[in-house]
Amino acid sequence: VVTFLYTHCRNTCPAQAQTARGALDDLGHDVPAIAISVDPARDTRASARAFLSKQHALGRIHFVLGTFKQLDPLWKGFAILPQRPTVEHIARFTLVDKRGFQRIGFPGDQATPERLAHDLKLLERE
């Protein structure tokens, strides 16, 4: 499970983290869940830890942090273009298969824990 978040977000990002955590709960076991920062200027290890702790996802979702230059290839690989100076991004989940291929994408408003867990189970069977 890959999604894009920032730690100072008050709207969609907490909901996305809850959806990912709920999918892991529904699945019954953890699979790699990664949140890639879209706010490298403000996201730090401490803020990522606090954000994930508040979402009860610490240790279950892993935050990828770095500089704009370091994160840019990841954003491009998933067709995410964070806007600066205000941070705006598309709320989206991407499921990646065992070989590292992007297989299923969900707009954030269409993703539910049940739907993500269902499709994760399908990918695990492959």
PLM regions and their residue ranges:
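Short active-site neighborhood of thiol/selenol oxidoreductases, capturing the structured segment around
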Residues: 1-20
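Structural micro-motif
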Residues: 60-61, 72, 78-94
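Solvent-exposed coil/turn segments that connect beta secondary-structure elements
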Residues: 6-7, 36-41, 57, 68-69, ...
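Sec/Tat-exported extracytoplasmic proteins
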Residues: 5, 13, 24-28, 55-56, ...
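Hydrophobic beta-strand anchors of alpha/beta hydrolase catalytic cores
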Residues: 1-2, 33, 93
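Thiol-/selenol-based redox modules, centered on thioredoxin-like
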Residues: 86-126
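Loop/helix-junction capping segments adjacent to catalytic residues or to phosphate/diphosphate-binding pockets
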Residues: 10-13, 41-45, 110-114
